[in-house]
Amino acid sequence: MEVTAAMVKDLRASTDAPMMDCKKALVECNGDMEKATAWLKERGIAQSAKKADRVAAEGLVGFKIADDFSQATVVEINSETDFVAQNDGFKNLVLKTTEEIYSTSPADVESLKSTAFGSFFSEAVVKIGEKIELRRFKTIKADDETVAINGYIHSNNRIAVIVSAKCDSKKTAEALRPMLKNVAMHASAMKPKTLSYRDFDAEYVQNETIGRIETIKKENEELARLKKPLKNVPEFISMCQLTDVVLAKAEAAIKETLKAQGKPEAIWDKIVPGQLARYIDDNTTLDKELALLDQTYVLNDKLTVGAAVEAAAKEVGGTAEIVDFVRLEVGEGIEKKVDDFAAEVAAQMS
């Protein structure tokens, strides 16, 4: 019986086995789906239903960077328990997987699973005996010698970061590499979610605005009860909301206040820029928390990360800006299952 791509896809969906193993199973079993599934399970390749339902939120990250800093790769592989994550077999799997991704640059996890390495990965998982998942990875490459790349992996192998910057010259790129490692260390600690405020989803910003304003209002109710100074309630939380119209309106309001205070119009030009900058600062809290370029740089609290990189490039007579970064932290965003042992025992006794 001819084995079609659709059959392989269906078997893959029902067993979570690599594509090549699914095809081999179907060929061996003459296209019989049930027999092919059994064939995979006998060899420990197919995920059992019980194992598939378990949560893999522990694990390690892998990190590899070229000797000439032209390319770097980060990988996250999850296990169910930290005990397995510290196993030599698991550590070796992370190392091998990182090297494979670094060398072959697969498009995504599914693409890697469909290769011969996917079969190797599955066999390694069977030996380890726990649910293991290759969750995500990213490789950043330099298009030319004017792109600087560096990265950092934390000592516990649970956080890894890569940062790249576009520079005006090879000289600037080489000089900036140590700085980029510091930026990567900054990102590992400060947990930015995006490169710039421009990367925020509009709906996310809107929802965050409503939520944050409501939180501040509730906090102010308690502060008022305690007769303490109230917090400022912003109109906005991100630069992406501060359109030309919004800023013009804010500037007009500042001038109206100065006029009401009787300040001479001749000195407004000296006052307005500072107050407008304060308005922007008060209304961009989301950017300062979650956008890498707008975060306060941990090694110089007078500069943002973006400004610090520009300053470092300027010191060597060049220009530079961060254009990409990736930060992987083990288990980030995965909801861990908390077992209620008493409830489990009660259920078994009922």
From Swiss-Prot:
Region ranges (Involved in Mg(2+) ion dislocation from EF-Tu): 81-84
Primary localization class, coarse: cytoplasm
Keyword Cytoplasm in annotation: yes
A GO term for molecular function: translation elongation factor activity
Subcellular location: Cytoplasm
Family listed: Belongs to the EF-Ts family.
Full protein name: Elongation factor Ts
Organism of this sequence: Sulfurimonas denitrificans (strain ATCC 33889 / DSM 1251)
Gene name, Swiss-Prot/TrEMBL: tsf
